[in-house]
């Protein structure tokens, strides 16, 4: 879910919703209230979708590495002259 694309899409959907609501009701006040409510519902849906993606990623990572995590995960990064393999095994950024 790429945030700028989502914002542009959300504004387009809200504009279409506002136009349709105005033609159906003929009231600017009612259109504004309903469009604001629609915007809040879209934001709640976006938040829940991002929360689901984070949960799913955490679940998949737990399945891939069922072993015990070290007590101090930054221990190998503190040692001089060593490259942490943990940094190399990171997945690519999902927004690209």
From Swiss-Prot:
Membrane topology category: Multi-pass membrane protein
Annotated pathway: Glycan metabolism; exopolysaccharide biosynthesis
GO biological process terms, semicolon-separated: polysaccharide biosynthetic process
Localization annotation: Cell membrane
Record region (Disordered): 64-96
Gene Ontology CC terms: plasma membrane
TM spans (from-to): 6-26, 35-55
Keyword Transmembrane attached: yes
Classification via InterPro entries: SyrA (IPR024239)
This protein's UniProt keywords: Cell membrane, Exopolysaccharide synthesis, Membrane, Nodulation, Plasmid, Transmembrane, Transmembrane helix
Keyword Ribonucleoprotein part of the UniProt annotation: no
Chief localization: membrane
Task of the protein: Inhibition of exopolysaccharide synthesis (EPS) and nodulation ability (NOD).
Record-given protein name: Exopolysaccharide production repressor protein
Encoding gene (name): exoX
